[in-house]
Regions:
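Short, acidic/small-residue loops that bind anionic groups at enzyme active sites
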Residues: 102-124
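Catalytic phosphate-donor-binding core of small-molecule kinases
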Residues: 2-6, 14, 19, 39, ...
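A short, basic/flexible loop-to-alpha-helix module at the beginning of a structural domain
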Residues: 73-81
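N-terminal glycine-rich "phosphate-gripper" loop used for MgATP/nucleotide binding
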Residues: 89-93
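Structural motif
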Residues: 85-86
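Short Gly/Thr/Asp-enriched flexible loops that form oxyanion-binding sites at enzyme active sites
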Residues: 95-104, 205-209
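A solvent-exposed, charged loop/short amphipathic helix patch at secondary-structure junctions
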Residues: 22-45
């Protein structure tokens, strides 16, 4: 058993003001840019201040004898989480999804710095509650949420909390063969395939499902099941439009075999952190063995 004190890893992403200053250099230039688009710098600055205040409160909540770290979302793929880490995501619900794919059982506490803007599905706690949450952490209920796995035939694997996307890197037409666990098989030309979890059922998959009269019923967030959708399948003499949606329950999988170059797999909107397929490579998509452990 490790004798190390727990380490709290605060995870955040750059605010809109941070992005504006990185692009335009000064507050005056950022204000001018926003005015040209009918927006006000004060509103952007207020959101930035709320996020900074939440991060300050979260940092002060860490017990003095615990270790701590602060990580930007852009650096997640280069950071090594330790088994004793406690992850505190300060930001939007999507930030929890972004960090989940890099974890292996570490508890996650979602802190909502802007409840007037963020629904709080995954970032459930106000900043001033964090001190008590960390103190009582061993006895708090943890909700396990299903994740989706995409495994290439060369051993590479990618996880997602909301969904994974398979398709062309530019989102143009991709050619591939889709195979299901029951032996069904069809060649496709489409703008990609989205496979989502119960957590992701309110996001991208929901947008697609609303356009389908025969959309499969979405799973619950903790249910070991996924739904999948083919986007804009194109009928031709060589490609079909019959296998365009379905559910994967338990150990069922979906296999996608590339029939071209430039095909990729990424999860939860993080396109730079992706798997790349060459012609003939296969990716198998199914319920992941890992789960997100979300502190309630």
């Amino acid at each position: 058993m490790s004798t190390l004190a727990p380490r709290v890893v605060l995870v955040s992403r750059r605010s809109e003001l941070d992005e504006l200053l990185a692009r335009h250099g000064t507050m005056a230039a950022a204000a001018y840019f926003l005015r040209q688009r009918g927006r006000d710098l004060d509103e952007v600055a207020a959101r930035h201040a709320a996020q900074q205040a939440a991060l300050t409160t979260a940092g002060a909540a860490v017990p003095a004898d615990w270790r701590r770290g602060h990580l930007d979302r852009a650096d997640l793929s280069r950071f090594l989480f330790a088994p004793e880490d406690v992850v505190v995501a300060v930001g939007q619900d999507g930030l929890v999804a972004n960090v989940a794919k890099y974890l292996d059982g570490q508890p996650v506490i979602g802190v909502n710095p802007a409840p007037d803007r963020n629904p709080g599905v995954l970032v459930r706690h106000p900043p001033d509650r964090l001190r008590r949450l960390l103190r009582d952490l061993p006895g708090l209920p943890v909700q396990e949420r299903t994740m989706v796995s995409a495994a290439l035939d060369d051993g590479q694997e990618l996880l997602g909390l909301n969904e994974i996307y398979f398709g062309h890197v530019t989102h143009q037409s991709a050619r591939y063969t889709l195979s299901t666990s029951d032996g069904s098989r069809e060649r496709h030309s489409s703008s990609g395939v989205v496979v989502g979890t119960g957590t992701g059922a309110t996001g991208w998959c929901s947008s697609i499902a609303r356009q389908r009269a025969d959309a499969p019923s979405p799973p619950a967030p903790g249910e070991a099941a996924l739904t999948w959708f083919v986007r804009e399948a194109w009928p031709s003499p060589a490609t079909g439009v019959t296998l365009t949606s379905g559910r994967l329950d338990g150990a069922q999988t979906l296999e996608l075999a590339s029939e071209g170059e430039g095909l990729v797999v990424f999860a939860d909107g993080l396109e730079p952190d992706r798997l790349e397929l060459s012609w003939g490579q296969r990716v198998t998509v199914g319920v992941a063995a890992r789960k997100l452990r979300l502190v309630m």
